[in-house]
């Protein structure tokens, strides 16, 4: 759980969310009229089996087989910190695949998606929000989620305000200036848009949305009174 400045107040809202592990094991196949089903995938991919993710190209010459696998974790405040956190995992991955494994510290969700789309990133742990964009635009194939002892790890959406405000419930957000994180963020944009609407508040209509870029930017912005919540 994030640590908040003493000047802020947090409201907890239940949210089903998990970290997703994805893999890109092949290069993008060329757009082809022969593709019977593509769904919402980019034209470079095909989904003939209807499982909502890109199919492995029928032409094996398009499969990727890099001598070095590039691994990345979802963008956080300091990407370099997580390189050490995942050192043991990368060693395990190298042992199991027989390949070298290198760390890529993505600075943003978009950078992570683009890196996999261009073939520069092969395996990644990504946030829930960008997953759909990664699947549709970059050929992400989700295959696992974080868990332990048969239990899945999740998290909660947290609505925080400055303690000097009179915001006590979601309806108090009306007419305010509210920080969201990025358009692709789940807890920082997509989830509140869905949950708040159910609570009678429509983000972007009932209050002004300002994208802060990062979760910690939102927290510090509230602490400094740049945003109402």
What is the predicted role of each segment?
Residues 134-146, 203:
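Ligand-binding "clamshell"
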Residues 110-124, 137, 171, 215-229:
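Short helices/loops that flank or line small-molecule/ion binding pockets
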Residues 66-68, 88, 98, 111, ...:
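Extracytoplasmic
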Residues 71-94, 129, 152-228:
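Bilobed "Venus flytrap"/periplasmic-binding protein-like clamshell domains
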Residues 102-105, 123-125, 142-144, 160, ...:
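Structural recognition of the beta-strand scaffold that forms the well-ordered cores
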Residues 2-14, 25-111:
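N-terminal hydrophobic or amphipathic helices and topogenic motifs
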Residues 143-150, 157:
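Glycine/small-residue-rich loop that forms an oxyanion/phosphate-binding "nest" at active or ligand-binding sites
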Residues 19-24:
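Hydrophobic core
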